[in-house]
């Protein structure tokens, strides 16, 4: 979902399975009690990202719960010479996260996520490790339109707060997002989201933004689109996104493709995901 909407997800409350990667506190306002998901992304033809996650809301009212997430990122192969023979090695990094979320009031949810990261840059080097924290908050309210079924949300996340990895500071991120959900009928629904993110430290310091929309039609079909504004030298750059999906309860399948120039990191990037919710 988030990939088809230009990476927006800080305030989107209907995708609990992958919320740990954006803002785990949004799960507090999810309509589902639990869910699992898996996605595969091919980035710029040479990079690969795999993600798996789950969430579970505890108790009848589901006011609190936990979420788990795993991501594995591979870079292009490096042609190296070692022990008198050529070695093809792909640098990689993976992280494992566990988060806890809780509704502290009817309209406010908070979350805290602990993540363990491990990276390996060269075949003959030891892996480097570190830990970091993500903090999230979401404020959600219904609107006095569409029989009070419409709603709006504001989400905040402070991510990658932790120790250095192999002597390098983690790319910390401060994000603020908003979303409006408009269910016109049981079969037709529009959702619009906007995210603003500020990345630091100084080497990658810049502001990036994304705006995305999702339309559910005929109960099961989904189409998405969005545009991401960024810095080509310090981040993902400027690119558009298109996406589609099928929601046939309890199964959810999604596909997205990035529309980017050749000098953009997101050039020829696509993602395929599948999930199950209950």
Sequence positions of predicted segments:
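Subset of outer-membrane beta-barrel
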Residues: 1-278
